[in-house]
Amino acid sequence: MKKLLPFLCASALALSLTACAGTINNSTADAASDVTFTFTNSGVIAAGETNTGYEIDGTVLTITDSGTYTVSGSCADGSIKVKKGTTGVTLVLDGLTLTSENTAAITCGKSSEVTILVSNGTENSLSDTEQNNDDNYPENENAENAVIKCKDGSTVTLCGDGELTITANGKNGIKSGATTDEDGEASLTIRDLTLNIDAPVNDAINAEQLLNVESGTLTIDAADDAIHCDLVLNIGADGTDGPTIDITNCCEGLEGAELNVCSGDITINASDDCLNAANSDLTDYDFTMTISGGTIDAYPSGGDGFDSNGDLTITGGTVIVWTDNTADNEPLDA
């Protein structure tokens, strides 16, 4: 038997979280392209200002300079790489279907600054194969363990008004790296687009440093975590509608050492905890979970609705938890 635990909280307290403050830049208009590329199974065809800012090797496109690059077409084994340290790059996905067999479909190199813009009204698909996993294929030196790989120190924004479907047959759907002294600050921001992720092996979205899911429509099916960040995970922002997130299947839904839900319409079906403030690699850390807005429907089949290994604060929003009526499964565990 399930029990329904509703928590209705008025936004009476002001948060001191900078994560929820400020306004979101919703500008995702399609950019004018410097170069247009068409992927085929036999190669990449360039049109526009050719021979500047990029390299083509068979079905591998490498971006080496700032600019706006539009990619379309279809390829059964190809990839896009943004070279280490390259900033001011906009990749426009304009009806692209791209599979990469043994590495990431898109790799953003260390210390790069990249906007991946999904063009208005287009449907795009990125995928990999089981070989893109160096745990299972240690001989594969090119494995990146994600369909979209954002390396340490990279700043990546995934946005636009189109639709992107990611199928992660190797390991993760999207993987974002860490902030380091050598490579700089790392972050991943998701905004506006329609994003579908099927991750039957591991996490749908996995970040090491800072992950902002500001807006858009996300549908996620994951074997492990749906949306995970080792440190700070922000969902929505104060004064905005926030994202619509539908997690149809996962082990844990939203997980971060500092987990902030500021706005959004979120449904989570999890075999363990729906929301979890934790990181097993951090032994001395002030874990926090703060809910200041949005609507959350949590369906934990074998865990807690909300599980914080530190403070749990609810100052606003609507929270509904459906949980088994057992001692091990609590609506709130803090």
Regions found by a protein language model. Give the residues of each.
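A composition-driven surface/loop motif
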Residues: P6-L15, C20-A334
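Hydrophobic alpha-helical transmembrane segments of integral membrane proteins
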Residues: K2-K3
